Amino acid sequence: MIVTLTLNPSLDRAVEVERLEPGTVIRATRATLDPGGKGVNVSRALLAASVPSRAVLPVGGPEGDQLVRLLRAEGVDVVAVQIRGGTRSNITLAEPDGTITKINEPGPTLSADELDAITEAVLAATGTADWVAACGSLPPGVTDDYYARLCGRLVSAGIRVAVDTSGPALLAAVSAGPTVVKPNREELAEAVDAPLRSVGEAVEAAQVLRSKGARDVLVSLGSDGALLVSEQGVVSGNAHVAEPRSTVGAGDALLAGYLAAGADGSAALAEGLAWAAAAVALPGSRMPAADQIHRTAVRLHDRTNLSRPLVSSG
């Protein structure tokens, strides 16, 4: 069982357009409405591949009710913690060439009592859990050390923890000793306050996070693939996608596949890459079913080329 926590979930509307032209009326060629949020997407990806998961999330207002309905319609085991504020809505605009424009609301402010209730819900959900994946941005009212404090309690209880966040929250969480953190290139660069122009620089930055407390660092690099830096060394890989549709949720699918495969070494990285590639081939933030995951598309690199330049933000 993998428990996920999404502190700032959303309703995600994805709209496909032929071309985004500011200041004009644009006709959509396709629109979808999906549950959103990093942890939510991890649970959805796990469910689609028949891996047991439970999603803990705060919800409020009509949008929150709709979010829970959508998740339960997909079969997700939801632990909904009611809050006074309304769940946010996000919009993604996708163009045929793969260009993505996102409009994300900040989300509701959480009170101290609401945050305590969420924490207790996570702890109560971990009875048979192998992992807790704490994912996404922190909503207003939540201090940067929240994931670190939660991670500390979970690690003390013998539960493995994955953290996917950014900025000060990522740096604080690393100090609490999570099993794995999953930044993308931009988030990793922000964490070390330096540009990452090559694979080698990304590896060095990941080692910095390991030196601060993270056991493993899984870095999503977009079209450049992904990178795993751990006690066993460095392994990298990528997966070809013939017809990309949307990158929304690809990093979440990467983490889900990695955790589902045991979160250890090159085999887990390969599984994560296969899940991520399958997600990119789907519209909006749809997560791939088991029969949509093509592992033959994955290529792991026996020797990571540290001088290879990075072209994608991840």
Identify the residue ranges that each predicted region occupies.
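Short acidic, glycine-rich surface-loop motifs adjacent to enzyme active sites
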Residues: 126-139
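Short, small-residue-enriched loops and turns at beta-alpha junctions
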Residues: 108-111, 138-142, 169-172, 190, ...
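Conserved phosphate/ATP/ADP-binding segment of small-molecule kinases
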Residues: 145-161, 165-232
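Conserved phosphate-binding/catalytic region of the ribokinase-like
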Residues: 200-314
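Conserved N-terminal subdomain of the carbohydrate kinase-like
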Residues: 18, 47-129, 297-314
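Hydrophobic anchor at the start of a short beta-strand
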Residues: 2, 52-54, 78, 161, ...
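Glycine-rich phosphate/adenosyl-contacting loop at the front of the ribokinase-like
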Residues: 1-56, 65-66, 241-244, 306-314
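Short beta-strand scaffold segments in enzyme catalytic cores
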Residues: 44, 89-93, 225-229
